């Protein structure tokens, strides 16, 4: 399956994996700065953005990770950084675990932002989408802009930072054919039943890892980030103040310096 992606800049590659219901748009506030030193690959996960949305129901973390691994192989990516947010962070974790078994691990650093990683209570709107009848009807019952505004208000700590451009961009992606059905399937498979079994393998990740977490995340609790930091041996945990679940959109001025500092230090440690 050919997933849609956008590329910017030149240099060591960074592969970006967005969260649930999002697209490559979520990275728009960090692209300009990071593309000055790196080649950025902004992927739309299966069922999201401009990528295919087949009715095959294969929208789990594992299924998404297999597609990401195929892209890494196809493009022969080396000295690679993966950045994953929320659901995309869960995909990044599974991908990092798989790459550990490669003869030559191409992953040089991992950045996880407010990441799905363990069993946890899901937000009400995700639980609703998982229900057999309501999940099918709900996306069609309310105007898309209303749904997007509600979700962004939950995701942002300061909802004054939610702009009309954001709402328009998220809404446009959800209007694409097949998007609503793909969203429902992804919601139903967001946290796999064996997530704690998978989590037991996190200590096997030896790649230098930066874990960023919004101080007021109401979707994936900050305790998840702290637990993840303990589990991954070569990790650094940073709380991003004055932000919710999407700090790279809400306070990019706080996120960017941390990413740049981490990339510089992890590259320096390789020489």
Language model feature labels by segment:
Residues 1-14, 35-38, 73-78, 260-271:
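Alpha/beta-hydrolase fold catalytic core
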Residues 3, 141-203:
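Conserved alpha/beta-hydrolase catalytic His-Asp/Glu region
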Residues 6-50:
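Conserved HGGG/HGGXW glycine-rich cap/lid loop of the alpha/beta-hydrolase fold
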Residues 216-220:
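Acidic catalytic loop of the alpha/beta-hydrolase fold
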Residues 235-271:
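Catalytic active-site module of serine/aspartate enzymes centered on a nucleophile-bearing elbow/loop
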């Amino acid at each position: 399956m050919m997933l849609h992606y956008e590329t910017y800049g030149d240099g060591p590659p960074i592969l970006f994996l967005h969260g649930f219901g999002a697209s490559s748009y979520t990275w728009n506030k960090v692209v300009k700065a990071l593309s000055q030193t790196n080649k950025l690959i902004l992927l739309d996960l299966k069922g999201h953005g401009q990528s295919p949305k087949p009715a095959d129901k294969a929208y789990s973390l594992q299924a998404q990770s297999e597609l990401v691994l195929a892209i890494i192989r196809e493009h022969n990516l080396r000295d690679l950084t993966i950045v994953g947010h929320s659901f995309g962070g869960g995909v990044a974790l599974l991908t990092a675990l798989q790459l550990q078994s490669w003869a030559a691990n191409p992953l040089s650093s991992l950045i996880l932002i407010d990441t799905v990683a363990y069993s946890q209570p899901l937000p009400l709107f995700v639980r609703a989408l998982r229900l057999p009848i309501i999940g099918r009807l709900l996306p069609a019952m309310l105007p898309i802009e209303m749904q997007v505004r509600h979700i962004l208000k939950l995701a942002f700590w300061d909802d004054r930072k939610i702009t009309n451009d954001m709402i328009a961009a998220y809404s446009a992606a959800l209007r694409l054919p097949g998007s609503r059905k793909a969203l429902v399937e992804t919601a139903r498979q967001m946290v796999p039943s064996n997530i704690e079994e998978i989590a037991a393998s996190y200590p096997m990740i030896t790649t230098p890892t930066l874990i960023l977490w919004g101080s007021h995340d109401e979707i994936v609790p900050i305790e998840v980030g702290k637990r993840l930091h303990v589990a991954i041996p070569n990790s650094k945990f940073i709380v991003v103040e004055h932000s919710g679940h999407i700090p790279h959109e809400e306070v990019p001025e706080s996120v960017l310096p941390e990413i740049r500092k981490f990339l510089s230090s992890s590259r320096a440690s390789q020489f």
